[in-house]
Amino acid sequence: MFLALREIVTARGRFFLIGGVVALITLLLVMLSGLTQGLSKQNTSALEALGEQTPYVTFSTEDPSFTESEIFAEDVPASGIPLGTSQTKLEGHGGVAVFGLPEGTQIPGSSTVIPEEGMVLSQSIDDALNAPSRGTLGGVDLDVNAVVEDEYYSHSPVVWVSTATWQKVSHSPEDMVGVAV
């Protein structure tokens, strides 16, 4: 112990240099963990907001693929709520994630429900477009029914629509009600 204290006193510069490097590495790790948490939150916050129920998906082919998944009305259990997701463009804004839920389903974190026709925008989209009353989502003209708190999916703000509207926007068959996520 005496030798260590004597070394610190005689070689102060080296001691502070090594201590500074350790402190900077610690700071780097803290900042990187915060960055990765933020990125992961923006990737899946809309899915996490839907609830804590664990989804179970069974694929019927040998090569399962989430991107090519299709869930039809007869595949949804009585207690299940089908969720359709897709990525498309909202005219004047750019890329958005579209979440299709059955009409009347409550949007997470809000008292707003999914309208029969039209769309519900995330706050950041509404701010960027200066509160529009209509918009073209994936080539389909829709009214803006409400604005809710921001949720994100795949780093894109979410637009909430009914299953029927989601089918039009994502160009899906009429009997397809969702995808595996």
Model regions and ranges:
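N-terminal Sec/SRP start-transfer signal
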Residues: 1-29, 40
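Short N-terminal helix-initiation segments at or just after the protein's N-terminus
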Residues: 1-5, 61, 122-128
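Single, functionally critical "micro-switch" positions that shape active/binding sites
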Residues: 10, 24, 81-83, 121
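A short alpha-helix capping/helix-coil boundary motif
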Residues: 21-24, 55-56, 172-174
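Hydrophobic, regular-secondary-structure patches
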Residues: 26-97
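Basic-flanked hydrophobic alpha-helices used for secretion and membrane insertion
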Residues: 52, 87-181
